[in-house]
A protein has these predicted regions:
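Helical element adjacent to the flavin cofactor pocket in flavoenzyme catalytic cores
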Residues: 1-35
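Hydrophobic/aromatic beta-strand patches that form the interior of the parallel beta-sheet core
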Residues: 8, 38, 173-175
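Active-site substrate-recognition segment that forms the wall
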Residues: 13-15, 31-71, 75-170
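Secondary-structure boundary/capping motif
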Residues: 17, 157, 182-186
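Beta-strand residues in well-ordered beta-sheet regions across diverse protein folds
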Residues: 26, 108, 175-176
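A conserved FAD-binding loop/helix module that cradles the flavin
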Residues: 117-124, 173-189
């Protein structure tokens, strides 16, 4: 990082106020003042009072198998690493990965709408059951493999497919809601 940048981790902003020509962010442990602020907080931009009722809070879910045994790798065959990624952000992704963590398969194919941005354990349990079925349908020859981890992640979509991006007020910018294509669209938007 540049010597002109200070990094404050685990410092949630509780308030953001315009003080003169600067912006002041209040955290549980203090205040940070800056002339310019970029809110890169995805769907949490609504908690700052912007883009109210224009964003959809979706969670997508993935699961990863346990390490494949040498026999399972032989049964699966093919290349050690491959992936199928959909053009639709909510489509199914399947990847075979290899590395320090062993040979595994990752599947992602479920989503839920969570306007409160807080999915619960029963949702994750339902997703796991769905992933187990999807995995066994796609890889019937690997019926003994278990899914070792299942997780979810927040994906913000806008109602009009436009990013929540730009200058909100003098010195206050938003870089939020990339509609499922964060790396690509975030780079394009600067």
């Amino acid at each position: 990082l540049s010597n002109r940048v200070r990094l404050y981790e685990s410092s949630p902003v509780e308030e953001l106020n315009k003080i003169g020509s600067d912006w002041q962010a209040k955290t549980p442990k203090g205040l940070v003042t800056a002339s310019k602020v970029i809110l890169a907080v995805n769907g949490n931009i609504e908690n700052f009072g912007y883009f109210q009722n224009s964003l959809l809070h979706i969670y997508t879910y993935g699961s990863i198998t346990q390490k494949l045994t040498p026999d399972q790798i032989k049964i699966l065959g093919g290349k050690k690493e491959w992936g199928i990624t959909p053009a639709d952000p909510l489509g199914t992704t399947v990847r075979r990965i290899s590395g320090i963590g062993g040979d595994r398969i990752v599947i992602r194919n479920r989503f839920t709408y969570n306007p409160n941005m807080n999915p619960n354990r029963s949702i994750l349990d339902n997703v796991l059951r769905s992933h187990v079925k999807s995995f066994s349908d796609r890889f019937p020859m690997l019926k003994d493999i278990k899914l070792s981890k299942t997780w979810g992640g927040h994906l913000t979509l806008s109602r009009n497919n436009v990013a929540a991006f730009g200058e909100l007020k003098p010195g206050l910018y938003s870089a939020c809601c990339q509609n499922g294509l964060g790396t690509v669209k975030g780079t394009l938007h600067g």
